Curated annotation (Swiss-Prot):
Group of enzyme by EC: transferase
Entry superkingdom: Bacteria
Organism annotation: Pseudomonas savastanoi pv. phaseolicola (strain 1448A / Race 6)
Catalytic activity, reaction form: guanosine(37) in tRNA + S-adenosyl-L-methionine = N(1)-methylguanosine(37) in tRNA + S-adenosyl-L-homocysteine + H(+)
UniProt xrefs under Pfam families: tRNA_m1G_MT
PANTHER family given in the database record: TRNA (GUANINE-N(1)-)-METHYLTRANSFERASE
HAMAP family found in the cross-reference section: TrmD
Name recorded for this polypeptide: tRNA (guanine-N(1)-)-methyltransferase
UniProt gene name: trmD
Length: 250
């Protein structure tokens, strides 16, 4: 059975229990689909204070993570993952992660994630060892651990056998370049709000058409930029035009 090996270099490895002990990612670990190991740079320091950071050259606020503890942790991670493992640094300067990139990463056999802290890590480590830099958005976080967990969760969902239903990953938002359609469950009526009749009809062709139309409409209203980079089929153009017309008439 194929599996993905992910090695994480982090000053806070305990945070990754959220991945290994809960939800879909935990199930993937238990099934052997995902192998997750954390390496703490503090374990590779030689001074009694386990120093992993120092003041930046040129002055300025904050601290910068030192090269040597990171390199020594990376050596161990490479021994575990193999020399072919892609090294990724979670960084606000990186390319923004999207579903297309997640699909590519899910094809890898092994990934090493670097979760930085403080003002970042010494640029010489990045130049020497990092293959790719990825960001999860244009906002500031305290470290790379949460972005690393986001990446791990997103990639794990695409591993064969990780989800309970074979179609679940294919029907997620962004998988086909569109936002997801609305979903409903019991009861049929709640606070005078009814489930759309088409979903109760049992007509699978009509249900598919309604869901596609809702996905197109939501994307048009909330993330029109996604439609600009997507070529719509004739059916999709018709459904979107109907959605806009019905919305404007209501």
């Amino acid at each position: 059975m194929a599996s993905l090996r992910i090695e994480v270099i982090s000053l806070f490895p305990e945070m990754f229990s959220a991945i290994s002990e809960y939800g879909i990612t935990s199930r993937a670990v238990k099934q052997g689909l995902l192998q997750l190991t954390c390496w703490n740079p503090r374990d590779y320091t030689t001074d009694r204070h386990h120093t992993v950071d120092d003041r930046p050259f040129g002055g300025g606020p904050g601290m910068v993570m030192k090269i040597k503890p990171l390199e020594d942790a990376l050596v161990q991670a490479r021994q575990a993952a193999g020399d072919a493992a892609k090294v990724i640094y979670l960084s606000p300067q990186g390319r923004q992660l999207n579903q297309s990139a997640v699909r590519e990463l899910a094809q890898e056999e092994a990934i090493i994630l670097i979760a930085g802290r403080y003002e970042g890590i010494d640029e010489r480590f990045i130049d020497a060892h990092v293959d790719e830099e990825w960001s999860i958005g244009d906002y500031v976080l305290s470290g790379g651990e949460l972005p690393a967990m986001v990446l791990i969760d997103a990639v794990t969902r695409l591993l064969p056998g990780a989800l309970g239903h074979v179609d679940s990953a294919e029907e997620d938002s962004f998988t086909d370049g569109l936002l997801d359609c609305p979903h409903y469950t019991r009861p049929e009526v709640y606070a005078d709000q009814r489930v759309p009749d088409v979903l109760l009809s049992g007509n699978h062709a009509h249900i598919r058409r309604w869901r596609l139309q809702q996905s197109l409409g939501r994307t048009y209203e909330r993330r029109a930029d996604l439609l600009e980079s997507r070529s719509l089929s004739g059916e999709e153009k018709k459904l979107l035009a109907e959605y806009i017309r019905e919305r404007d008439d209501s």
